[in-house]
Each structure stands twice: as structure tokens, then as C-alpha cells.
Amino acid sequence: MNKIQFWTCTPLVFALALAGCGTLAPTYEQPAAPVASNWPKGEAYQADSPTAQAAIDLAWRDLFVDQRLEQLLELALKENRDLRIAALNIERARALYQVQRSDLFPTISADGEGNRQRLPADLSGGRSGGATPKQYSATVGFAAYELDLFGRVRSLNEEALQRFLATEEARKSTQISLIAEVASSYLTLASDQALLELAQDTLKNQRDAYDLIKRSFDLGVASQLDLRQAQTSVEVSRADVARFTRAVAQDRNALELLVGKNIPKELLPDSNLEGAAAMVELRADIPSEVLQRRPDVESAERLLQASNARIGAARAAFFPSITL
């Protein structure tokens, strides 16, 4: 008789033991980075300046010297549409994670009710003043709850968590890309503005040269070939001015599209390209660990961990589930 009871209790003990275990997901192992462990040596790898700083230790505000560019980047981080969408995706992933995490715990509900009624004397058995019966009731229960014996719910919760973290890293990647694009467009606009001024000065000089040759031609000193060559130079310079004028307009439109709103004139670059492109001096040697800190790499690894957790949920689906 005792032996029969032992075998009857064995499945229950086994189920409780499984409930205390982890999940059926495989052990996650971080992939090895395909980079060299040491910094290469040779003539091409010169020593850095003593004042050079490591880029990994600097925030984006510390990289640029131009104050207008810094203010423009802050405006872009506030107004850019893609960055807003990335932030909304984070809120969505956070909500999904909270919903998935709630499945780990039972939902308990409680309800109470009271009723008091006064009866007249002719209906209360002749009691003076009537009767006042009272009724009270209370119910406590919980919604359907799955006993997570094989870690299916925990695996799904881990998957939702990793996807939420991957979304956060994707937002960081979008932010870094936005900073790089705005800085590049800013420098491109400054470069084209400098080229436009150079083209305008060249056109003015070519016109002056043409006028001089034209007077010489009228006096019979210069030949018609000299006059035509001077006229050709003027037309080439005029075409350069038109080309760079169009390029400046396109650069400004692209920059405003990145920022997300009209850019104030005081934040636009001038023709001083050297001042606009000034940056702090950075060290050339960057440790390979920086690759693991890149948001796009972090996001990819989080998605890999989410897929790893989903394997545990798929394995647990082969076993029976108990729902209370």
C-alpha cells in the first residue's frame, strides 16, 4: 500500500521539482569577435600625440568645437522624426514586456457585497418597528493561471525582455546615425558655401579679364581667339556658380529634413570651413571592445538572446501544461 502511494506521489514531486528549475532554453554563449586581440604595429601605426583623447571616453558634445554645430545637433535630437519613432517603439516594447511578465503571476480578484433591508411591522411577524435583515457576501478568486513547470512562460518573458533591450539599443543606434548625418550635412553645406564664394570670385575675375581682352580686341591688340577663350572661361565660371548655388540649396534642404524643422540662420555654417570642421584631437588606437559597445551590435546580440529564449519556449511546448 505504501508502495502504491509512493508511485502516485512521484509525478507530483517531479512536477514541483521542474517548477523550481530554470527553463529549457540552451545556454547562451556570446559569439567571439572576429578581430585581433592586440593593436597592430608598424610604420603605418604611429604613436599618438600626448594631448590626444580616446574617442570611447568622450560624449558626442565633446567631439565638436563649433558651438553652432553642437546647438544644431541638440535641435535635431529633439525634433527628428525617426528618433521620435524609435522612442515610441521603445514604449511599445516596454508595454509588451510588462504584459508578458504579468503572466508569471496569478491575477487575484476580490469582490464584496452588503445588503440591508427594512421590513414593515406587518411583514416581520408583528415585531414593533419592523425588522432589518442584513446580508453580506464576499468572493475571492483568480483568473486562469498556468503553472510554469517547464519554463515556457519564463522563456517568453525573457524573450520579451531581450527584444525590449534590443529596441533600446536600436534607438541609440538611430541617435548615433542622426548625429553623424547632421554633422556630415553641416560640413557639406559649409564646404559648398565656400566653393560657391570661390566660384563667385572666379566669375568676377573672369568677367574683368574678359572686359580687358574685349577692349584689347576693339583696339586690335588681342585676337578673336583670345576673346572667345575669355568668353568661354566666363561661361564656365557662371556654370560653376549655378552648380554650387543649387548644391547649397540642396544641402540646406537635406539638413532641415534631418533636423525636422526650419533651421535658424544663426545656426547655419559660414564659409569658414576650417572652423566648422574643427574637432578635438582623437587617438588612433581604439580597443576592439568598442565593437561590443556599438548599439547595432548590442541590438543584434539582444535579438540573438531573444531567439535563444524562444527555443526554450518551443521546447517547453512539447510538454503538457497545467492551468488553474
Region locations from a protein language model:
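Small/polar-residue-enriched beta-strand and adjacent coil segments characteristic
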Residues: T27, N38, L58-A59, V65-L75, ...
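A ubiquitous short alpha-helical element
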Residues: Q53-A59, R127-G130, A194-A199
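A short structural micro-motif
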Residues: R92-L96, V234-S237, S307
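Conserved Rossmann-like nucleotide-binding pocket used by diverse enzymes
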Residues: A17, A143, S185
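Periplasmic alpha-helical coiled-coil/stalk elements that build and connect Gram-negative outer-membrane
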Residues: V153, E169-I286
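Terminal intrinsically disordered/low-complexity segments used for targeting and assembly
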Residues: K3-C9, L16-K78, N157, L161, ...
